[in-house]
Curated annotation (Swiss-Prot):
The keyword Lyase applies. Coiled coil: none annotated. Keywords: Aromatic hydrocarbons catabolism, Lyase. InterPro entries: Fumarylacetoacetase-like_C, Fumarylacetoacetase_C_sf, Hydratase-Decarb/MhpD_sf. This is TodF product hydratase. Pathway: Xenobiotic degradation; toluene degradation. The lineage of its organism: Bacteria, Pseudomonadati, Pseudomonadota, Gammaproteobacteria, Pseudomonadales. GO terms for molecular function: 2-oxopent-4-enoate hydratase activity. Gene3D superfamilies: Fumarylacetoacetase-like, C-terminal domain. One of its GO terms (biological process) is toluene catabolic process. Its EC number is 4.2.-.-.
Length: 268
């Protein structure tokens, strides 16, 4: 290993340790781009992988993936031309009737999304949309509670990738629908906080269509040797702007043709 490779590997480990400690302590840290640079996506995913392996060794169960940066506007803001992804673990799932503690996620914000659950594996190097149609068992409305271990959300692309794509928690709705029962691209979304609209959008805001995002992810995961498997949940990306969370907030999301989902937060 060259001196440069050794230095890069050391930076990856330091960044992973920093984010791991932020998760453990509940105290946000400085941007990890200071260690791995602003443009080294390979290093950023290596950081994510270090902490993914830590989670698996600790007994956490991998249950799917989340897709981020599916908005073209956000991609331009961060200087990238593709989404990113992070891991979903079983202990990140919350139910609609469950009150979510505000400190369960650092600097929480919420996004409305469509979640897809697979009934078949998605592997192979030439996946198509038709493969998605066969593999997706159902879709449900979802609220993702994103968070950042980076102080004040001061992030660039490598920060968010390293930080498991700014993942936190998620809530799935209870109205599963088959793909043939609704149009995910045209589905309109409205999010309300305490009954007041705070975010809105449409499926097409998610990389042109949520299925485009899922296909991108499936291909990337297959190439990486970690394909999406039967039973995996995929959070396909935000349908509208994310909204900051305060104690006592109750968010209701309605997605046309798909149903609704609610996330309630404990008072501070």
């Amino acid at each position: 290993m060259s001196e440069l490779d050794t230095a890069r590997t050391g930076a990856v480990r330091k960044a992973a340790d920093l984010l791991y400690e932020a998760t453990r302590s509940g105290v946000a840290v400085v941007p990890v781009r200071n260690l791995i640079g602003e443009t080294d996506l390979e290093a950023a995913y290596a950081v994510q992988e270090v902490n993914t392996q830590r989670a698996l060794v600790a007994g956490r169960r991998l249950v799917g993936r989340k897709i981020g940066l599916t908005s073209v506007a956000v991609q331009k803001q961060l200087g990238v031309e593709q989404p990113d992804y992070g891991m979903l673990f079983a202990d990140m799932a919350r139910t609609e009737g469950e009150e979510i503690a505000l400190d369960d996620v650092l600097q929480p914000k919420v996004e409305a999304e469509i979640a897809f659950v697979l009934g078949r594996d998605l592997d192979g190097d030439q996946l198509t949309v038709a493969d998605l149609f066969r593999a997706i068992e159902f879709a449900v409305p979802a609220i993702e509670i994103v968070g950042s271990r980076i102080t004040n959300w001061d992030i660039r692309i490598t920060d968010t990738i390293a930080d498991n794509a700014s993942s936190g928690l998620y809530v799935l709705g209870s109205t599963p629908k088959r793909l043939c029962d609704f149009d995910s691209r045209q589905a309109g979304m409205v999010m309300e906080r305490q009954g007041i609209p705070v975010s809105s959008g449409v499926g097409a805001a998610c990389l042109g269509a949520p299925l485009n995002a899922v296909l991108w992810l499936a291909r990337v995961m297959a190439r990486a040797g970690r394909p999406l498997r039967t039973g995996d949940t995929v959070l396909s990306g935000a349908l509208g702007p994310m909204v900051p969370v305060a104690g006592g907030d109750v968010f209701d999301v309605r997605i046309a043709g798909l149903g609704s989902v609610t996330a309630a937060f404990a008072k501070a």
